[in-house]
Amino acid sequence: MYLDIDKCAIGNSYDKPYQVVFHEAGHGIDSACRKLVNESGVFASHFSGAYKGGLFPQTIKDEVMELVNAYDKQLKQEYKARGEKYYKVYAYKALENEIRAYNSYARADLSDILEGATGGKVQCGYGHGAKYWKDRTIGGISDGLATEAFAEMTDSTMSNPESLELIKKYFPKSYKIYEKMLEVMLNG
């Protein structure tokens, strides 16, 4: 891992000081601990992707779909009442607009996770791009989503309380799995 520590120390418009250090350290830990998971038929490159057969990225996706489906239900009714045609893309856009209302420090990590979980259908200003997520799906497991979410949760836990608050709000089940993964990593 190579970082410009002087730049990391001051942060930027969406990362708090040292947040990038904790993010990259999260990736390093996630990769180094991969060997702790010995699940047959799981080809993920990272601990977070391999853990319990992809439980972490699947839970993230499930939580995102719960949010999208809640908007979908509400918006369908509103559009029907007005006699207008409705498309599910409106639900994704509504979630995106909700997240974009938060400041950059609070939403950047969440934005990346949402982009990964939706394959780019939700883009809140920060992310890796749709191709990144597609290229990092291994054996049906969204390994890219897993490792980025692991790193985002690590950096927010260590250096960005605003971001952590939103992650816990939008991904409570996934964050609990993150904590369980840390326990497994620590206990080897």
Labelled PLM ranges:
Residues 1-188:
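Active-site-flanking segments in enzyme catalytic domains
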